[in-house]
Each structure stands twice: as structure tokens, then as C-alpha cells.
Amino acid sequence: MRKLLLSVFLCFAMVMGLLPTATFALELGNAPWSVEKAPTSALKGQTVKEEPVFEYGEQKNAPRVANLPTQNDATDIYVSSTGNDAQNTGTKDLPFATLAKAVDAAADGATIYVMSDLTMDQCARFYDKSLKITSGEGGPFTITRSADFKQQSDTARSWYNPAMIEVQSSSASFVGLTLSDIVLDDAGMRKGTVFAQAVSGDSNEDNTVYVQDAIIASNATVPCTVTLGKGAVLRNFGGMSAVRATDQAKIVMESGSVIEDTLTGYTRTKGSEAGSVGPAGAIWLQGGTLVMEEGSKIRNMDGRGVYADGGKVEIGGAISSIAANKSAMWQTNNGIAIHLRNNAEGTLTSTALIEKISSGSIIYCAGGAKSFKMESGSKITDCARLNGNVIYAQNSTVVIDGEISNVYATGNHILQTAGGTAVTIGENGRILNNHAHYGAVT
């Protein structure tokens, strides 16, 4: 009777949720199964095998809520030297550790906030989206190229030495990158030994021998704009250039952006390897477009400002304090400020200023270049040790409606032409207070 009453009580307690069903089964003594406690001896000395963390990978046994998505839907992504690519989600409290992971995870239109100085050892390459990169609280911060920068591959070049950031397209109609309040420093570093363009297409060429093409590069085949906004600084390029744009890519330098050298005593070299032609310049165009707006600067540079192998160059900012490096640069010291060739077009707008250029010609408009124009208000001035032509033009069109003044062109001309070049000096054109061995215009 007591056992019957106990059974009734236990049934009632189970129904009311006062006891677990396992208690009911054990107490009744006639359950079809039993719950056994694992013996402690079975757990003694047992270890959990940890899998190593690989790039972009996860520990197989690491605790996690869900697998990390390949693209983060958040509009803000965060990166810090104290972050973690494998386990964090890119939030402010759980930042990524590398810019490469951040651009990979970021959705189209996202802003990436760099929260500390970083040393970068792999390319931040992204496809088919537009991103912004800026410094977070406490910035501006500096991202510096590592001496151990990793190679990467694509379908055109196989394995090669990449830029710090690459903006590419495969299917999107528009892509882009905007930098502001951040410093990217190549630190004069390079991987590879040959200063020349890597070879694309079907070839047995070993592209790993070529140095990196830029700090930032875009080979986009759809409209792409790389914008250096206020506070964006590119320093000490160690490869072919600071920024390279080809095909439909466009570079815009807004007011407050700077490309410069800051390393004491730094001079570029092209090495002695076969096939090495030397660095191109701070900006390297191959069919792309450059727009330097008023207030932007290319300054304190060894070698060259702009090298345009095709494309359009529009200068409204300042190019200053550039010393030619005849033994190192591609095309030697021809066009220290701007080198135009291969149907390229160059224009100095009304706010353009070129000054303090030394040891070579300032503007080179030859090699198949199309035209060079100085608009009213533009100036080329204060070049006390030029030792070259201000402008050299061949088989092209030159318009001077700005001012060329205070230039000491030892043993050379202010404007030297060849091969049927058409020259127009506009109503606002002024060539004054210069020293030229052969004359102002020949």
C-alpha cells in the first residue's frame, strides 16, 4: 500500500514539473533504461586535441556560437593589433587583427576603422565592392609594410609581390576605395629584385622576381575610384609607385591628402638585375585617370611625381621639392614632376603649383604623348637648380596660359620642342624672370 501511494505521489510530482522524469523511472525500479554516471577513472588524464590556427581558419575545437560569415553585414568594421581574425567578428569590442581580414569580411559600402598602428604582412585585396578605411579614436594611425610581406596569386600573374591594398573587379559595375585620416607607409621596403611591370597572360615568367607595383593598386576593368581623402598619407614607396591605376581606374587626391618621402637620406634604386627599368613615380598611370584637387600634395620626393603611360592627368594641387634620380628612375630624369607618353594628356588647372624641382626636366610630353596644357592661374616656379628644360615636347600639343617664373635652366630651354609640336601661348601666359641657356622657346 505504501509503495502504491509513493507511485501516485511521484506521478503527480512529475506531471506538475516538481521532479525530473529520470527520478520517476529510478524510484519505480521497473524503467526500461537506467542513467549511469561515468566513472571518474574514464576522465583522468584525458586531453582535448587542439587544431592549429591557420590564416582565416578556426580551431576545430574552439568554442563558438556559429561559423564566422565570409561577409559581415555591419556597416562598421574594426581592426586592431590586439584583435583576432579567427575568433572575433570585427565589432568595436571584438576587432579583427588584420586589414586583409577586414576587407574580406566587410560588406559593400562598409567603413573600416583602424584602432591602432599596424604592421601589415599580407595584401588587403577585395573585389566588387566599395569600402572606406579610416582611423578610429586616437588616430591617425599608421599601417606599415612588413619586411616579410607575403606573395599572392591571381589568374593573370600567378604568384607575384602585391601592393598593400588592391581594389579589383570581377562582376560589379562599380568598385572603389576611400582613405582618410590614415597613413600607409611602405617604409622603403620591397619584395623582389627587378623594378619592372609583372607579366600578365600566358607566360612562363616568374613574376615573384618583380617588386610590388604600389602601396595601393587597381587594375579594375569597370569604373573604379581610389580616393585619398583628407588626412590620407602614402609614404616612402619601395616598389614601382605609391599608387598605380590601369584601365578604368581613377585616382582622386582630395584636399589634405599627401604622398611623400620621410626617410632620412632615402634614395631609390633600380638594382642591377636584368630587365630592371627602375621605379615609375609616386603615381603610375596606365590608361587610368588622375585628379589632384587643390590642397593635395606630392612632396619631398626622390625620383618623380607622376608617370603617365597613357591616361589623363589633371593637377590642381602642389608638386614640390622633388629631386631627379637619373640613375634609378624609369626614363631617367625626363619629367620629374610629370612624365607623359603613349597618348597621355596632362593639364595644370588654375590652382596647380609646381615648385622646387631639381636636376632634370619638369614636364616631359613625348614618347607618343598627346598634349600638355597650363590653364590660367597655374604656376611652375622657384626651381633654382633645374639643370634641364621646364617643358620638353615632341609631336604633341602644348598650351601655356599660366606662369613659368624664377627657373634656372642651366644649359637648356624653358620650352624645347621637336617633331612638329604645336605651341600656343595664351593671353594669360607669362614666361618671366628665368635663366635659360638657349632661350625661352625653341
Language-model region placement:
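Right-handed parallel beta-helix/beta-solenoid
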Residues: L26-K101
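C-terminal segment of classical bacterial N-terminal signal peptides
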Residues: V15-F24
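Right-handed parallel beta-helix
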Residues: G139, S173-G188, G201, E205-D206, ...
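Extracellular beta-strand-rich solenoid/capping regions of secreted or surface-exposed proteins
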Residues: D104-D108, T119-T134, T142-T225, M240-Q248, ...
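Glycine-rich repeat segments that build the extracellular carbohydrate-interaction surface of secreted
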Residues: I77-S81, A97, K101-M120, K132-E137, ...
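Residue-level detector of conserved, well-ordered beta-strand and adjacent loop positions
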Residues: V79-S80, M115, T134, T144, ...
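Positively charged n-region of N-terminal signal peptides that target proteins for export
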Residues: M1-F9
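Short glycine/acidic-rich loop motifs that flank beta-strands on beta-rich extracellular proteins
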Residues: D121-A124, R145-K150, N161, V183-V194, ...
